[in-house]
Amino acid sequence: MTEHQAEEQADTPPTKVKATPTPTPSGKFKDAKEDAFLSTSPDSANGDAQHKLPADQLAMSSSAHPQQAGQARPLILQAFHRCSSPEQCVTLHDILDSFKAPLSEDQAWALIHQFAGLYHQVAVQAHTCAADYEAALPTGFELHFHRDGSVHFSGPDQLTPKEQLQQEQIPLPPQHDVIVDQPDHSASSSGDSSVINRAFDNSNHHHHHQHHHPPLVVSHRKIISELAEIVYTALDYNLPEDEECQVSQELENLFNFMTADETDDDCIDEGIDEGDKRWDDESEEERNDTKELEHIIETCRNHIKTTLPENHYRAVCRALVTETIELRVFLQQVLNNEAGAEKLIKASESSATTQQELAKLGFNDWARFWVQVIDELRRGVRLKKSNHERTPIEYELTPYEILMGDIRAKKYQLRKVMVNGDIPPRVKKDAHAMILEFIRSRPPLKKASDRQLGPPRMCEPSPREQLMESIRKGKELKQITPPEAPTLRERVLPSANSTLSRSRQRLIKVDFSKFQDDDLFYDENSISSSHSTAATHQHHPHFAEMHRCSQPKMPPYPFGGYMVPSQARQDCRETASLMRPRRTMEPAKQVPPPEEPSFTKDEYHKFYDTALESYDLATQCESRRASLRRHTIVGCQSNLDETHSMPPTRPESRQSDDVSKETPKRSPAEQTHPSDEGSSTSSLGPWNKSFMDKQTWMERGDDRLSVTLAEIVHIRSVMTKAELEGLPMDVRVKEDVEKRRVCFLCLRTRFSFFGPWGIQCKLCQRTVCAKCYTKMRIPSEHFRNVPLVLISPSLLSSPASSSTPSPSHHAQQAHSSSTGNIMDDQFPKSLIERLLRSESDRKTRSTVGSAPSSPKHQRSNMSTPGISVGPGASSSSAAATGQAVEALHDQATMSSSYSAAMRPSGVHQQQKQHYNNAMSRSMEGPRSLPVHSPAYRPLSNNSTLERKSRFSRGFNLFSSGSHLAQTQEQKENLRGEQVTVCNDCQGLVNEITSSVKQKRSSARNRTIQNLTLDLTPVWK
């Protein structure tokens, strides 16, 4: 506002407005019109939808119908019209008088934008009625706000009766004068009302100047100037006379532009781009008429950085109206309605605050508290960080000097002063609580129990939700009966179809009267296999031994051999005489299963006689035996034929005349059972019997590696890390094992600082306890021809020397149970420990249960030169010279032990002795031959024994005398240094060493066998 305008306003007498305050004695609202206005609430009849024809819609609808010249009055009434919904309309004076506080700067920007935009819609059509447009403008107007955010002007002039008849289509309700009651002591604002009256005064002070612009521009400038004065007065409302409102520089520049003098051309064109493309199609006159309004609107839009400034300013106006109406409703409940006031006071007051203290608050106090609460809700309350650092105490200056220094440095904080100075903080706090309680109750909410939610929308679940739902439901498993325990025949000689599940097979009894029993039956596979192979035995005799190649799938075991449960020994003795050997193999092509046949006694004996003849013919000469080895289980592995230099055991019934004389009427089953047992045990070594799976040998049997000790250490460390990933996570076992707190193998011994301490394995880097480790010698740094299955993590199993299983043992046990391994829970622990004893224990004891030692093993020890059994022979030299011999006969030892476990006592003891004698003669030749003949070779031949005897004698001579200490040192170097290894690594090294020794000795025996005359076929 310029000084010239201030002087003109001082000279011009103020005009009164319709909204005049009238004081009331008790601070209550007595006027009926005011009560009607105060009873309006935000949720009454949905006020947002009740207003009719907002100002902007009226302007847009009327713009489609251009007005004729001389009809300026209806055009101006589009903006300066009387509101048709007074209950939803609030004037600017009502807003200021309700809050008793000035507007904020954001609200001032919203007022300027909304009213400038409304007047711009009328100004763009003012050139059609330029003759009487200025005369139709009202001499004073007031700003009105609707609850939806729209605005309009209100002029004090009345229409003539003739004009009212012309505007019948436009509803014009009677003028509604809002009279605001003032409280007795705090609602006086006479000085502020005079300022508003001066703003509403239209003294036409612009007419005494010279008009350099068109009449429309002057009219627009008059409206813009009055709008700026009204907004500035609202910003300066209820402030002291000596205090000026603080506005930003941008808003101050806008006020200067809106109130600029008519002769100031620079201010008119300020910020206007002459080359703007918006006015390229308009005339120069229309462009100059509204450029001030467009500049004002553009400035307001640039002030807000949002994409839609119109929505923002509309929301500000809507919030201003809503807060005013809510405050009036709240004051009406507190000051007029005792029931509502008591309810709010009881909901918010504390024990120290009374109803009388809250009732003492005046209108201005409640309005100020309302503004504070709304400001906190909009801006939020942030807690300041408390500074706990205490400043050092000042002793050099006196308190007076410290105070004066703070005043000079302006180190002080201004305290907030109460309005009346007597409102305690607790009352202020309770007043805020009352206001918040009122805000929460608007609109009233229903109880959660009374609410009824509609049906949920049926939406199609996403693929992820479907997957999670299927995981939650789980898969229903079918009810299956537990599998029956397999018989001994199924364990030792399973069906030909090894890939299918093990099926129950019928045992053919010699008692032919019970041959067709209902409880015994054949399955289709066994019947078809018997028929298909019976016809091929005469033409293909090598098929007789091929059946032994098909064994049940089982993981390889380091020490090999099928185990027999102790509780099944009685069943073995009962069914041994009832079982016939199945020497046939499943043909290459399956035939459809025929009907179940019925055998006669002649057909029964003829069938097995043919099988025995084929077996005898196939084992009479060396070429036949080589052909047999290629088609049996030995042929499934390329290196397995090198481990057996002796011919397989012949049928017992064809080799023992004494036994056949004693039992001339033995049944075919009893005659062939020992040969079947011998061929299934003695022909397979302890390591080979653990690889009975044909597919395993086809895939991994030929794989051998040449690795060093460092590579084995690396492989074992990788396998250790893999086993760590398989440990359970929920019981902290994995964490303890990783941090080396618990033994890796037994998972029972816990290490501590005071003991026991863990020992780290040199190969796999595991930390084990004293029970799970041992010290052994590793004689070589490089191992050749190491089978791949020994270092494979899926095939390697932990040794049984440890009484407690390792983590890998649990995984292998689960694997064996799923693949049908015979090592199930039926085997007693004592039998497993005896069968899985370490190599040194098996060599010293070489027995299982009560069975005697193998005659083959005893004979080899007695007949081998260089082995001393007397007291003068040293144990170390005997062990050194007999190590190779015992390694060669390890297979025969396990075979005899296995047969002894099946028939430990009774009549079977004599049969076992006869079986061992027959096996020895079949491998050594007839008894009539001399001991040193080529046919009689317990190991390989004469030359081998002679070389070993010479080496043993030379070694004994060299060991005597002064060279004994040096010899012992050399022996220690050859045997290797003792290292600490766990039980798993010990079994691995033992198996690698024995496999390498077996490979070396079998290759040597095969070479000697080719150069030696074999007289076994000519012996009869």
From Swiss-Prot:
Residues 846-866 have a biased composition (Polar residues). Residues 399-417, 463-480 form the WH2 domain. PROSITE patterns: KIND, WH2. Phosphorylated by Jnk kinase (bsk). The keyword DNA repair does not apply. SUPFAM superfamilies: FYVE/PHD zinc finger. InterPro entries: KIND_dom, Spire, WH2_dom, Znf_FYVE_PHD, Znf_RING/FYVE/PHD. Belongs to the spire family. This is Protein spire. It comes from Drosophila melanogaster.
